[in-house]
Amino acid sequence: MERNSKLINKKFIQYLIPSILTIFAMQFTSLLDAILIGNLIGSTALSASAMCVPIIYIVQMPGLALGIGGSIVVGSLLGKRDVDKANKAFSACIIYGIGVSIIFAILAPIISRPISEMFAEDLREDIYQYVFITLLTDPIIVFALLMSSFMSVDNNPRLATIYFIISDILKISSMFLFIKVFNWGMYGASFSTGFGFLVGAIVIFWYGFSKKRMLKFTFKIKNTFIDLKESLRASGSMAINYLLTAVQMSIINVVISNLVTNIVDLSIYGLICNMVFVFDLISGGIVGVIPTLCGIFNGEKDIYSLKSVTKKIYFMNLISAIIITILVFSLPNVYSILFGFEFVEYQENANMLIRIYVFSFIPYELNRFTTNYYPSINKNAPSYLTVFLRELFFVLPLTLALLYGAGIKGYAVAQVLTELLTVICTYIFIFIIEIKNKQKKSLFMIDDIIYLSYDFSVDNNILNASKVSLEISNFCIKNNIDNRSAQMIGLSAEEMISNIITYGYKNKKQNFIDVNLKKIDNTLILRIRDDGMPFDPTKYEIDNDEKYTTSGIKLVESITNKMQYMRILNLNNTILEINIGGK
């Protein structure tokens, strides 16, 4: 018997689609946001909103970084079946994330005006309005970002998608109302984001009553920082990335707003800066499943699933990046028209700069994969290297040098060089580490299994139950495990799989069950994973009145030393342990 990826592929698609829809909704809304600002308020306002991006990175960092890092840790803990620690990590992220965002909100009246004064005079009032409301509504937005990440990892990816779609619809419709009808200008443009997330939060109440939910908020404030440590470690590269990005973008924006006095060039700069929303329309959603899937599979030490999913994410991300690059390169006119670019006589110049800048997209997405993936498998070095190379060593020197030498064109070229050089250096570093550690020189740095393990999959044919028992028993005996332990674990597997096939599937379609047996020290650990109806065998009680019983479960309980159950990724995970030799 061999392992296949059919069960995991099905689950991958079930998580990938909501992730793509979520990020698509976010990025598409950001695109519409910029389009509405450019068309309803003007090109100067669009440039001002581009200047505000670094501030948005900083104030939303608690939600963005802790959301990703926290979901990696929570997913890993759920994979290790430690629900109590997962609840503590989840609660700590919410408490500290909201706490930091409240500080930003309190500082809004104090720091908004000084921030706007750093920029060119024509942009100051628009920047002040946008920054003030962004800071004021930050607690709402951070809460939304955190909850969407945790809902995804906690068996509810569709709810996270619904939350963003509802919030984004409310944002765009209210933005039009606030700008066009109420004439609130940039106040309205910024306030619409917080308004959308606030009203859309009704979805979080649905999550609270979800039967699939495993995470629970704990109100124990004591020792929350200890519970936060792992999440901070996992989100460290993300946080540094957002912080350094904000710092270098702030420096570049201040230089550009004072160096480039031509309103046409400033408008083109606004066009280029907003291209990141186009970049992430599809690719962002593909990378977005990394914390959930890779974090959980790494926690479970399910190497087969981790390798399978990682390769799919990497190559899908690369292919989508290539497709979007070709589309934008071919249709720069469409892009600039959408954003309300008013200077028709300078269209060719705008097209040239768009075409240069779009070549940064493929290496940009490869770098995004690096910063998201490696923390999920507890290999932070490549992620940190990517962040420091891109945000410190390359982007500022190259951008400032080329800006002074070639203006906005120099800025576009600098971004391409920055992303490309970062990818090359990071990949060289990864392969050096793999060679040094005598690994197989894999880009994904997945460690080999160091214990006895056997993976295979079976379809939901009742005849397979007895075959599984024989397969497992033979494997154990071949690997010098005593006959009694081999028979006990084989019998347990047969009973559990028979129960899954008989009662877990209502339809007669072919479904697959993944089986993993591993020997750690003197313990045999059997994990059975299926996508049948939710059923917790540890809570099963025989009912004398029911027509059919699964009394074999009680037999399994009596012959195993430990039985655990968890519903992870909307999959039943039953774990049985037997001490070898009855020890």
Q: Regions from the language model: what does each represent?
A:
Residues M1-L16, V74-T137, V181-S235, C294-F359, ...:
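Short alpha-helical transmembrane segments in multi-pass integral membrane proteins
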Residues Q14-D33, I133, S167, G196-G200, ...:
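Transmembrane helical elements of multi-pass membrane transporters/channels
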Residues L46-F104, A144-L159, I268-L327, L366-S383:
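Small-residue-rich hydrophobic transmembrane alpha-helices
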Residues G67, S71, I133-V153, A160-D168, ...:
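Short runs within selected transmembrane alpha-helices of multi-pass transporters and secretion channels
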Residues K441-F456, S558-K583:
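Flexible, glycine-/charge-rich segments associated with ATP-binding catalytic modules
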Residues L526-T550:
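Glycine-rich/acidic phosphate-handling loop/turn and adjacent ATP-lid/helix
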